[in-house]
Regions:
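Conserved flavin/dinucleotide-binding core of flavoenzymes
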Residues: 42, 99-100, 318-415
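Conserved Rossmann-like nucleotide-cofactor binding loop
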Residues: 11, 33, 263
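Mid-domain catalytic core of redox enzymes
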Residues: 231-361
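N-terminal Rossmann-like FAD-binding beta1-loop-alpha1 element of flavoenzymes
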Residues: 2-27
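Mobile amphipathic helical/loop "lid" adjacent to a hydrophobic cofactor/ligand pocket
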Residues: 61-180
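Helical element adjacent to the flavin cofactor pocket in flavoenzyme catalytic cores
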Residues: 188-246
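N-terminal glycine-rich dinucleotide-binding loop that anchors FAD/FMN and/or NAD(P) in oxidoreductases
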Residues: 41-67
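Glycine-rich FAD pyrophosphate-binding loop
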Residues: 20-44
């Protein structure tokens, strides 16, 4: 069959990798590179070159089994990294890094701060109580994180300086949106990733040489069928197949795989079905401004508080997530220069220290979106169309691979 695949992120490339075995595929990519959120940038400092990841960075040995199996098939090497999380609040001056006891009290005054100790106690209480509530079915499907925190009487320091900014950093969502986040979804993710345990946590990893190292081997078997700078403009379907309108004109296909974002897929459909409107319309995305730079002022004031992920508080709770990734820690970069990737903080960065600007869209989760996710199978096959993407689950690389495998199963293909 002739199959059009729209999008070349992890979902699109995995779909193409599998479907290319027996079918005639064409991958349409609007950008001038393939990989989607996997975008490694080469920079040079003091005569040395470094490959810095600006989108997809980390994965772990607990919750990425299919992605790791794919890397194994491709012969792509990876190495362990350190995952740690810090919060800094310019208003109160509070900052900490949860990596160790020493870094937790990087700001030594926290040792004698009752509010800080209340936060620590509530971290331990939340980790214990929320798992017990989940296991004993005491979390209603309609309950949000904010409702649970209020009902449980958790202190404001725990809410505002720990659990909500951590969620905002993970899903690139505003603090307000995190308060409205579906609690069951939140707790299952935190439990599965060891985030509700002090000691029992997965080993996080990065791909050696940068995340983009898997792109060439993954696409090698079909690279001649990839069209860069070729955005799809409209998709029409009829009883016999699919018409794809792109900058190349009109082309006819038997099937189409939408491996782009949910909102993009819905916008491309000339005549979306009621199910497509309802399901895809509930799966929202939001843009995040991303800057690669060397301005360490966006990290905590005390170097001991520098973590892999660093959340900066301040401003209204509705503003987009403000997180900075310390790439030297994450990628094990040996350099006197500290490379940072910051979300939604462009105005605070010294312009002369900016190495690159990018924009990535991330799924925005809600009670409606979780309900829509459960209906994925309804959009696999009808009208010769298949939809895949990380938005069908937690929004990460493993989820993109799993969604592509669901599509591939309909064509009798598997990893």
């Amino acid at each position: 069959m002739k199959i059009a695949i729209i999008g070349s992120g992890i979902s699109g490339l995995t779909s193409a990798y599998l479907l290319n075995r027996k079918h005639q595929i064409t991958v349409f990519e609007a950008s001038d590179w393939i990989g989607g959120h996997t975008h490694t940038v080469e920079v040079e400092t003091a005569g040395k070159r470094f490959a810095i990841d600006t989108g997809f960075i980390v994965f772990n040995n607990w919750t990425y089994p299919h992605f790791i199996r794919l890397l194994g098939q491709l012969g792509v090497a990876y190495k362990p990294t350190q995952m740690s999380f810090s919060v800094s609040d310019p208003v109160s001056g509070t900052e900490y890094n949860g990596n160790s006891l020493n870094s937790l009290f990087a700001q030594r005054s926290n040792l004698i701060s009752p509010r800080f100790w209340n936060m620590v106690r509530d971290i331990l209480r939340f980790n214990r109580e929320v798992i017990d509530d989940l296991n004993n079915y005491r979390i209603h499907p309609s309950m949000t994180l904010g409702q649970y925190l209020k009902a449980g009487g958790y202190c404001s320091r725990f809410t505002e300086h720990y659990i909500v900014p951590m969620g905002a950093a993970i899903w690139s969502m505003s603090l307000q949106d995190m308060l409205d986040f579906p609690l069951q979804f939140f707790v299952r993710f935190f439990k599965n990733h060891g985030l509700l345990s002090v000691n029992n946590r997965p080993q996080w990893c990065v791909i050696e040489g940068g995340s983009s190292r898997y792109i060439d081997p993954l696409s090698a078997s079909f690279k001649q069928h990839i069209r860069l700078n070729c955005p799809v403009q409209r998709v029409e379907r009829d009883a016999e197949g699919v018409n794809i309108y792109s900058t190349n004109g009109l082309e006819r296909f038997d099937k189409v795989v939408f491996a782009c974002h949910s909102d993009q897929a819905l916008a491309l459909l000339a005549q979306p079905s009621a199910q497509e409107r309802q399901i895809l319309g509930a799966l929202r995305y939001a843009d995040n401004d991303v800057v690669l730079h060397t301005d360490t002022r966006l990290l905590p004031q005390r170097p001991l508080a520098w973590a892999s992920w660093n959340y900066r508080l301040g401003g209204p709770v509705e503003q987009p997530a403000a997180v900075t990734y310390n790439m030297n820690i994450l990628q094990g970069i040996q350099s006197d220069t500290t490379f940072c990737v910051s979300l939604n903080q462009s105005a605070q960065i010294e312009p002369s220290k900016i190495l690159g600007r990018y924009s990535y869209s991330h799924p925005q989760y809600s009670l409606d979106s979780v309900g829509a996710q459960s209906r994925h199978e309804e959009l696999l096959g009808p009208n010769h169309s298949y939809f895949c993407g990380a938005y069908w689950a937690n929004g990460f690389h493993e989820d993109g691979v799993v969604s592509a495998l669901r599509v591939a199963r309909h064509f009798d293909e598997a990893l």
